[in-house]
Amino acid sequence: MPALPILALALAPLLVNGQLSGSVGPLTSAHSKAATKTCNVLDYGAVADNSTDIGSALSEAWDACSDGGLIYIPPGDYAMDTWVSLSGGKATAIILDGTIYRTGTDGGNMILVENSSDFELYSNSSSGAVQGFGYVYHREGDLDGPRILRLQDVSNFAVHDIILVDAPAFHFVMDDCSDGEVYNMAIRGGNSGGLDGIDVWGSNIWVHDVEVTNKDECVTVKSPANNILVESIYCNWSGGCAMGSLGADTDITDILYRNVYTWSSNQMYMIKSNGGSGTVNNTVLENFIGHGNAYSLDVDSYWSSMTAVDGDGVQLSNITFKNWKGTEADGAERGPIKVVCSDTAPCTDITIEDFAMWTESGDEQTYTCESAYGDGFCLEDSDSTTSYTTTQTVTTAPSGYSATTMAADLTTDFGTTASIPIPTIPTSFYPGLTAISPLASAATTA
């Protein structure tokens, strides 16, 4: 087998500024893993004929390399009829340079990586993909098919330079993971709820330079979570980024979202709950640009789309919304500021500053606050936290609301009844910024 054009990575995990608590990423490079052992799935029975099931070959390659090594999926088209549970890896990497097409019909997760450390999944060519063909389910009204990718209890990891398309259910879930980095990804799903882009909970995780198209979660933090940094995110006809849904014993702290661009989505950012308990604190949401979204800043502690949970409500405190620009679809119907907090667990120390948005339809917009205390717009600045409701109507556009768009903004969604094409990974995910890390394809050809 010819030598693999493996992306050169630093031996030490990366440390960045922000809400992270320490270094993130694999502890050893793909080069060192390959030098220990290389397991090509073709040697374990895989055939790039878009017919032969790759599931057993990938499982066997993992078993052979899980104690240290690199698993290689060469360019080509592979069918996946049986799902894989890849467990107990130590210093293991997977290079996906081919395209995996779902042919199986089981539920669960097509690819589950669990109880592993020092793990990396990426594509040398930045074109490796998994095509879930979710439309086969969705056109029948079925949203209970498999997820594409799930990491569970994985530490010191990276997932990058891969494309996930048309998941029957969620696209990518990180469940109780730590010290990880996710970047340079494109996720493209159907235009329906229940088809989440990225859901993450855990500790010390950096998600950046990701494009998501769907109609549910773009990049969403769930509980429990701490020290999560999310930046340079392109929600391109999506549900939008969010926190939640939040229920009993919520425990979220030290979260930073910045440089988030949202186009034709449900919201720019939503914190959603209905009853429940616990806390969300020390969160910053800054440098947001939006256009054509139904909601913009949306905190809803009585979110009717979830069943009410026992408890007085999730306590939100020390949350800052800063430097938001752009336009919303209809500011009279759904104003750009909505901070609706629980009467029995009011929000405290909320800050809204440098916020300038204007309606695309009509000539007025509203700001609504309920039981929310802090500084800015309709928030009440008071030592008292008794319940209140106020709505302000604005008929003059604020200065500085104008914001640029992205050239790749979609003009329509991909529906739910036809196959969705595999996109390429962009090199910019926020106006005026290039990706923090170059695509792997650029590094391997340099």
Curated annotation (Swiss-Prot):
Residues 1-18 form the signal peptide. It is found in: Secreted. One of its GO terms (cellular component) is extracellular region. GO terms for molecular function: polygalacturonase activity; rhamnogalacturonan alpha-L-rhamnopyranosyl-(1->4)-alpha-D-galactopyranosyluronide lyase activity. Its EC number is 3.2.1.171. This is Probable rhamnogalacturonase A. The keyword Hydrolase applies. The gene is rhgA.
